[in-house]
Amino acid sequence: SNIWNWAHEVRPTQPLTSCLDGSIGDSIIELNKNKSDIITFHTYEAKKFKPTIQELLKIGRPLICTEYMAREYGTTFEFCLPIFKEQNIGCYNWGLVAGKSQTNFSWKTILHLNERRDKGEFIEEGDKLTEPEVWFHDIFRKDGSSFSDAETNFIKQILHGATNE
């Protein structure tokens, strides 16, 4: 509360926000909701996507979704971007180019890690790491090629009305 009060006293030129997701405890979430100039949130599950947005729109402040795209949970660009556009919600996704952080791999990749290690299901240093069939995050490979040309064409189309025809 003191930090919010100080921040509002300073009155920076940019809006203040603290993401509702990742905040611990109902009182902190409520404080962040009440004090933020812009409501920032993230949601990865398709079934919770629209209800979450409908609830947050009731607050009456601009919304920015700071994390949303997880293909295996149904929150694809094709699913999310039309909703953001229709509701005038800002967004950015986690991951652009598959790289060091390996966010093209699912959270499930590390499940049962010890059992997989015991079975020898790990690559050795110098072995080529094969990409997952369905990427979790990220859009491009290191060489600049798309994970999915259809997906990148959709993004271009919804943002600019452009296509690669």
Sequence positions of predicted segments:
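Substrate-binding clefts and catalytic carboxylate motifs of secreted carbohydrate-active enzymes
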Residues: 2-165
